[in-house]
Amino acid sequence: MAARRGQKVKLLYIIKILTELTDEDHPLSATEICEKLAAYDITAERKAIYDDINCLIDFGYDIISTRVPKNGYFLASRDFELPEVFLLGDAVRTAKFISEKKTRELTSKLDRLLSKYQSKRNIQGIYIDSSNKTHNEELFYNIDRINTAIAEGKKIKFTYSKRVLREGRQITTESKTRVVSPYAMTWQFDYYYLIGNYEKYNNLMNLRIDRIHSVEILDEPIRHFREVSDYRDTFDVADYTKKLFGMFGGNMQEVKLRCSNKILEQVTDRFGDSIFITNVTDATFDFTVKAAVSDALVTWIMNYEDKIEVITPTELRDKIKNRAEQILKIYKKS
């Protein structure tokens, strides 16, 4: 009985063996496949393996017979090729909104799409920078609930956390309950955002999904996005997110900034929670960070208008003065 059952699942184990143990550089002969099957308590003859391989090929598997580097078979095509798995793995590892635990789970699943030899070449998969990873293990459950609410046109209720300054330079987290009409989710600048409308206001808002907890779908229809945006029939996520700016680069220097407490979230999003904060008052705080002094950094600082003042270096202060004077000249002409 066990032998008959083994023969019924033999094809499944053969494709498992070819998937996990073969690639272009590592074919397996029919005899070797028989030996691998024996590890699963399945007996097979070498000649029968040829028929089994042909059945799998007829079904659609891209199994190649080769004589280089030795006689044997290997699985030539997979659902995801090696560079695709590497690319997806890098995206998962660098995504700040995916926790370290979930990152390891996802990259492990991606590795199972490769042969064991290909997986060994994925050296990058060993390293995960956990310093900026979220600790929110609810993330994927919340994404599923939010997606369901969007599909059903229902409002959602959740708690939303944000960083605040407490007792001098201590950064802590506070949470508030919100009811939101969800319209879309988007991945921007290493974070996953919910785009929606907070019921108290007549505009759109972007909320970091890694800061969302305890999502509840309400039995209440959403407020239509046409009431709070210029979109009518379709909410155009690509158009909406086009205004977001990207990363900056250049020569690294120590930059000391004086910031309004109102933009603590934006500052820690950009530079992380480990920034060294000094000179805290009821209105402002100072911090020093290594940053690229470039036109892009000038743009980022000026985006916050009077909420950021550059203390040092003088070079950066001068760049901002010059940019402000150039803008002023344009508007003085009119």
Model-derived features: positions:
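A structural signal for short hydrophobic beta-strand segments in well-ordered beta-sheet cores
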Residues: 63, 185, 215, 277-278
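Polybasic (Lys/Arg-rich)
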Residues: 234-334
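General beta-strand recognition
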Residues: 72-74, 157, 193-195, 286, ...
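Short, basic/aromatic recognition patches that contact phosphate-bearing ligands
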Residues: 1-91, 173, 326-334
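Bulky hydrophobic/aromatic content
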Residues: 81-167
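Core beta-strand-centered patch of the WYL/Sm-like small regulatory domain
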Residues: 130-246, 250-256
